[in-house]
From Swiss-Prot:
It comes from Streptomyces coelicolor (strain ATCC BAA-471 / A3(2) / M145). GO terms for biological process: leucyl-tRNA aminoacylation. GO terms for molecular function: aminoacyl-tRNA deacylase activity; ATP binding; leucine-tRNA ligase activity. A motif ('HIGH' region) lies at residues 71-82. This is Leucine--tRNA ligase. Pfam families: Anticodon_1, tRNA-synt_1_2, tRNA-synt_1g.
Length: 966
């Protein structure tokens, strides 16, 4: 049986107890409670005003706005990998409701996109028809999972009522410019006023008054300032797709990310967003966001602003050039690191290790050549994101060469390490471990010098041997930075940078430089199924915005939905859009309300990219039925405004895939900042906390032709896999219909129930880690629910089986198990560690099962409340059986008694050179001195040391002692 074979079903024997928790019972319970929630509006989150206003007491509570990256309504529907993030946010939202929050959690659809257009091309069916059918199917699938969404707030980006405001936002951006002095967007009318008054000189028209310029000349001038502008510029033209592509949609080898067609540079007139104007703010404000470091890193690298200095480090008559943003710390550079791909690695790697090379630097290899080759092979298997992400263990090897620090003449060792990339800067860094966290960790791992050159302001002193982390503040004075030709001691960071950069330039050892990578966002697509631009052109080709009264500009009917595609290798072709074929729609006579009366115009026939609708959808969730304005300011302030810990405001939690790091997430941040500058919103950032869930993977089986075969029909024999008698290969990868390995949530819900599916997906592992699907393992969570049910309900009678026992009469072991579970589950749910929360619930449930006899009612009630966020249907049913009329959704989450939570002892691991040699049971409050004495006196430790001296003992009471022998 394959891992994706759903044949392993919930066990039901013929003589099963009549009131046992079964798949049939789960189906009945789940359907009934889902109907109840809908009828009662259980998940309705009240606004402070407007048509969705509600209970003032609930509005007065702390609020949480929890969002998923909304789905595209695919015709294939959902497989079990899709709901992973949706279930996780639902668990978290339920927990937040139970801890006293007004929780907004809903879900819409990102419904413009290429698949529906391709289906329309193939079948002639309008994209809206197929898309709405797909949405209906997915809504049914999602409802069956018991997701607690406020359905009043749902919408699709294809709704004219929605994309009216997408078009409106485009016009706000079109009618704005970025004031570099004010560091914000301003209405274009204010720029026109400056030109008209003479306050600002008209660029390109020296000496001419604004009033003397023709309309076309004025339009050209303003086009150089507008935040949305059309220009004739080199674009990425893909003849095979018949459309132009943004930089982000082109692979490193110059092909389309979708379809793998050749992409050529071609000069075309296209719409662009001047996102580069916001590069500094987009970069700087990342520091205020609670996002994964890997995502921040991708955005930082994509934006690519780097201001600092180029520094040359001599090596054997050659030089290694680095780019550093902290030239003021040059005296603190104690080693260098090259990216594994750096072209100088081979050149500088000698045949033998230099005399005195430490064993820890060699990676266990006999020669530098072997060490570097092995390390490069290891690094080649990692993505850039994996290489740069924060990690506890830093890896690398010494290449066997030393470079000269130009400011003090010191010889510093040169390493190769995967946390340095070739695609950024020069592919080489000067490492200043005292003032960079990654360099600090690397230096500690390889026992490299850590020299303080920026005086700490936190009282830790300059003796780095006592430091636990780097000191990276800019608000400090430079120390230990005096050489023969230049001294920085006593200077502030900014002044020190200027002085050392001047010295580098005088000495011919470097120069001040700026690095910047971000480009303006190409915003035109030659597609049908997208938002039309609210722009028309007059007979002179000048662009004019439609007035608000003409929004939404809806998509017209066309006979052919596809753009014209060409020979993929024909670079001399030009786009032909579907909208351009509807002559009656393209050529119109309109009165734009500008005092000129009716005039002939030509509509823009490109459409907006599929990213447009997702750039602002968090705002529509707040006030989804408002037809008069983008969002009511009071409602936006309530849910998304700046507050303590969130200086830029934004959604409290946003969960979705890491693949959107430099597309959707960057674009949405840009739009938010423009809307903030123009006073339409109070939140300058859309999403304060971002969490990237992992992927549920599945095995893909392929025959000798490389074609995927149905996973459910593959048989395993003697460690090999066969399909219809033919041996097939197996590889872990994505799950999907085309790979013939998809398992649908409908199948699992039918076999076990939605609560079991929810528990299994949450229990598979940490939420941010990818994990393989195994249908055979689902039954484990089903059995947990059966045991839970059995601890509360008599399977023979269906009556409660709990005991009404006073808290004081419950045995201490049960109380300790209960309160430790309550404490642990609360912490785990808050930290989104759902797999360990389920493990703690299981541990408590098992304790109660083994204890025998009826479970005390107060213990059973708290157990049900612990389960409620994870398995809400069975929790509701048990809560009702326990005599409660209210829904468990808004009950208070249990609170642990600290007296029962403290462990009497904890396990301390004793390591020698990083290897575990002993485990000690010690008091949680043991001092570091006493712990060190106990570790050194342990028989196993004494034997392992074998009489060797001790160079250092690292103690982290009460759980770790690390001994470094002499």
């Amino acid at each position: 049986m394959s891992e994706t074979n759903p044949a392993a079903t919930a066990p039901v024997s013929a003589d099963a107890a009549p009131h046992r928790y079964t798949a049939a019972m789960a189906a009945e319970i789940e359907a009934r409670w889902q109907d109840f929630w809908d009828a009662e509006g259980t998940y309705a989150a009240p606004n402070p005003k407007g048509d969705l206003a509600g209970d003032p007491e609930l509005v007065a509570k702390p609020k949480k706005f929890i969002m998923d990256m909304f789905p595209y309504p695919s015709g294939a529907g959902l497989h079990v990998g899709h709901p992973l993030g949706y279930i996780a946010t639902d668990v978290f939202a339920r927990f937040q409701r139970m801890t006293g929050h007004n929780v907004l959690h809903t879900l819409g659809f990102d419904a413009f996109g290429l698949p529906a257009e391709q289906y329309a091309v193939q079948t002639g069916t309008h994209p809206r028809v197929s898309t709405e059918a797909n949405m209906k199917n997915m809504q049914s699938q999602l409802r069956r999972l018991g997701l607690g969404h406020d359905r009043r707030r749902s919408f699709a980006t294809i709704d004219p009522e929605y994309y009216k405001w997408t078009q409106w936002i485009f016009l706000q951006i079109f009618n704005s410019w970025y004031d570099d002095e004010a560091k914000k967007a301003r209405p274009i009318a204010e720029l026109v006023a400056q030109f008209a008054s003479g306050e600002r000189e008209v660029p390109g028209h020296a000496g001419r008054a604004w009033s003397s310029l023709s309309e076309a000349e004025r339009a050209d001038v303003l086009g150089e300032y507008r935040l949305a502008y059309a220009s004739d510029a080199p674009v990425n033209w893909c003849p095979g797709l018949g459309t132009v592509l943004a930089n982000e949609e082109v692979t490193a080898d110059g092909r389309s990310e979708r379809g793998n067609f050749p992409v050529f540079k071609s000069k075309l007139r296209q719409w662009n967003m001047r996102i580069t104007a916001y590069a500094d703010r987009l970069l700087d404000d990342l520091d205020q966001l609670d996002w994964p470091e890997a995502i921040k890193l991708q955005q930082r690298n994509w934006i690519g602003r780097s201001e600092g200095a180029r520094v040359d480090f001599p090596v054997d008559g050659e030089r290694i050039t680095v780019f550093t943003t902290r030239p003021d710390t040059l005296f603190g550079a104690t080693y260098m690191v090259l990216a594994p791909e750096h072209p100088l690695v081979e050149k500088f790697t000698p045949a033998v290790w230099p005399e005195g090379t430490r064993d820890a630097w060699t990676g266990g290899h006999a020669t530098p050549t072997e060490a570097v080759a092995a390390y490069r092979a290891q690094a080649a298997s990692k993505s850039d994101v994996e290489r740069q992400a924060e990690a506890k263990d830093k890896t690398g090897v010494f290449i066997g060469a030393y470079a000269t620090n130009p400011v003090n003449g010191e010889q510093v060792p040169v390493f190769v390490a995967d946390y340095v990339l070739m695609g950024y800067g020069t592919g080489a860094i000067m490492a200043v471990p005292a003032h960079d966290s990654r360099d600090f960790e690397f230096a500690r791992a390889f026992e490299l010098p850590v020299r303080c050159v920026v005086e700490p302001t936190d009282g830790r002193g300059t003796d780095t041997s006592t430091w636990d982390e780097a000191f990276a503040s800019y608000d400090a004075k430079i120390v230990n930075s005096s050489g023969t030709d230049v001294s920085l001691d006593g200077l502030g960071v900014v002044e020190a940078k200027e002085r050392v950069t001047e010295w580098l330039e005088r000495a011919g050892a470097g120069a001040g430089t700026v690095n910047f990578r971000l480009r303006d966002w190409l915003f035109s697509r030659q597609r049908y199924w997208g938002e039309p631009f609210p722009i028309v052109y007059d007979e002179d080709g000048i662009a004019h915005p439609l007035p608000d009264s003409m929004l939404p500009l809806e998509l017209p009917e066309v006979e052919d939905y596809s753009p014209r595609t060409f020979d993929p290798d024909d670079a001399d072709t030009k786009p032909e859009t579907p909208l351009s074929r509807n002559e009656d729609w393209v050529h119109v006579t309109l009165d734009l309300g500008d005092g000129r009366g009716p005039r002939k115009y030509r509509r823009e026939t490109n459409t907006m990219p599929n990213w447009a609708g997702s750039c602002w959808y968090e705002l529509r969730y707040l006030d989804p039925h408002n037809g008069e304005r983008l969002v009511d300011p009071e409602i936006e302030q309530y849910w998304m405004g700046p507050r303590e810990g969130l200086p830029h405001g934004g959604v409290d939690l946003y969960v979705g895939g890491a693949e959107h790091a430099v597309l959707h997430l960057l674009y949405a941040r840009f739009w938010s900042k423009v809307l903030f500058d123009l006073g339409h919103v109070s939140s300058a950032e859309p999403f304060h906390k971002l969490f990237n869930q992992g992927m549920i993977q599945a095995y893909v089986y392929r025959d000798s032709r490389g074609i995927a075969v149905p996973a459910a029909e593959v048989e395993e024999r003697d460690g090999a896999y066969y399909y219809q008698g033919e041996k097939v290969s197996r590889l872990l990868g994505k799950m999907g219909k085309s790979l013939k390995n998809a398992v649908t949530p409908d199948e699992i819900c039918a076999e076990y129930g939605a609560d079991t599916l929810r528990l299994y997906e949450m229990a598979m592992g940490p939420l941010d880690v990818s994990r393989p699907w195994d249908t055979r393992a689902v039954v484990g969570q089903f059995r947990l629910l059966q045991r839970l049910w059995r601890n509360v309900v008599d399977e023979d009678t269906g009556e409660l089986s709990v005991a009404d026992v006073a808290e004081s009469d419950i045995d201490a072991g049960t109380l300790r198990a209960l309160h430790k579970a309550v404490d642990g589950v609360r912490q785990d749910l808050e930290g989104m560690r759902f797999n360990t929360a389920i493990a703690k619930v299981t541990e408590l449930n098992n304790h109660l099962t083994k204890a025998g006899g009826p479970v005390p009612r107060s213990v059973a009630e708290r157990l049900v409340l612990l389960v409620a966020p994870l398995a809400p249907h069975v929790a509701e049913e048990l809560w009702r059986k326990l005599g409660h009329e209210s829904s468990v959704v808004h009950e208070d989450f249990p609170v642990a008694d600290p007296a029962y939570v403290v462990d009497e002892t904890v396990t301390c691991v004793v390591q020698i050179k990083g290897k575990v040699k002993a485990r000690l049971e010690v008091a949680p409050s043991i001092s570091e001195d006493d712990l060190e004495k106990a570790a050194l006196a342990d028989e196993k430790v004494v034997a392992a040391l074998g009489g060797a001296g001790i160079r250092k003992v690292i103690v982290r009471a009460p759980k770790l002692v690390n001994i470094v022998p002499a």
